Regions:
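N-terminal active-site segment of His-dependent metallophosphoesterases
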Residues: 1-53
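Active-site neighborhood of phospho(di)ester-bond hydrolases with catalytic His/Asp-centered motifs
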Residues: 8-9, 34-38, 64-69, 135, ...
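Short, glycine/acidic-enriched loop or turn micro-motifs at the edges of active sites
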Residues: 12-14, 42, 72, 139, ...
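Glycine-rich phosphate-binding loop signature in dinucleotide/nucleotide-binding domains
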Residues: 25-30, 60, 129, 182
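Active-site neighborhood of divalent metal-dependent phosphoester bond hydrolases
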Residues: 43-130
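Acidic, His/Gly-enriched loop-helix segments that form or flank divalent-metal centers
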Residues: 95, 100-235, 241-245
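Short acidic-glycine loop/turn motifs at beta-strand connectors
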Residues: 129-130, 253-260
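Short, solvent-exposed aromatic-acidic interface loops
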Residues: 265-268
Length: 268
């Protein structure tokens, strides 16, 4: 077991600035395993550079990587002609991968034989260690044991792992009451920019508010921790790279034994 886990998720084509944060964390914490949390594509201009880095880290540096919902959108477009990807960043990703835009049919053909596409669609959905569950969006206690599922799986568990937002954060969505973590393990996720998340606890414990008011183009997306007494924490980490160009990600370092957050690398 490594002494530390480095978690880096949701770069959305940020490229070198995000890569530099990951390398900075790796240099400071050499006794670590890096786990990438998905959503490497769409949004910014450098999807190919971002995916190449993740690919090389997995193939040659003992890192692990998860798929995110944007990788699933790409998969559904290529394999099932689902155009939803095209309103979520497909054009910038296709241009990054191939140097120019293509018709949908040609893009499908080119992606289907692309080694980085093949790499992405075969990534796992959940990674579990003795102390942690790493997942792109969220987990429920009854769906945290099957690590064989991939993007072609159509179960609710896979949907939840890739897409869940409020149904993961809250037990009472209307009143934004945080759910308990009943898994017995610390859960690390990305997917939702943390500045959009707020809530409170069911025991009177103070919660936290959103940093986005609906008016500003940029807003803070710090690490958020949800934790009830005598339960493991849930860490929310998405730095908002998909929509906030000045953000380069939250790269987090966790102690593998205590499951505590040690340090965050970002450009905030």
């Amino acid at each position: 077991m490594p002494k530390y886990y480095i978690w880096a998720s949701d770069p959305h084509g940020t490229g070198q600035p995000w890569i530099d944060l990951v390398k900075e964390a790796q240099e400071k914490y050499p006794d670590s395993e890096t786990i990438f949390g998905g959503d490497y594509i769409d949004g910014n201009k450098f999807s190919l550079e971002t995916v190449k880095f993740v690919y090389d880290q997995v193939k040659f540096h003992q890192a692990s990587a998860l798929a995110g919902n944007h990788e699933q959108l790409m998969y559904e477009f290529v394999e099932h002609n689902n155009d939803l990807w095209y309103i979520n960043g497909a054009k910038s990703t296709i241009k990054s991968f191939f140097g120019r835009g293509y018709s949908k049919r040609v893009a499908q053909e080119k992606l289907r034989s692309n080694p980085y596409y093949i790499f992405l669609i075969n990534l796992p959905i959940v990674i579990e260690t003795p102390k942690f569950i790493f997942v792109h969006a969220g987990i429920t206690p009854e769906t945290n044991t099957n690590h064989q599922r991939r993007l072609n799986d159509k179960t609710y568990a896979t949907y939840f792992n890739l897409w869940a937002r409020n149904e993961y954060f809250y037990s009472n969505i209307k009143n934004k009451i945080f759910a308990h973590n009943l898994t017995g393990k610390t859960i690390i996720s990305g997917h939702t920019p943390t500045g959009l998340i707020s809530g409170r606890y069911d025991n009177g414990q103070a919660g936290f508010d959103v940093t986005y008011t609906g008016e500003q183009n940029e807003f803070a997306c710090p690490i958020r921790k949800i934790q009830y007494p005598n339960e493991p924490a849930r860490y929310l980490t998405d730095n908002g790279c998909h929509g906030i160009r000045s953000h380069y990600g939250n790269v987090c370092v966790f102690n593998s034994r205590s499951a505590k957050l040690i340090e965050v690398f970002n450009n905030d």
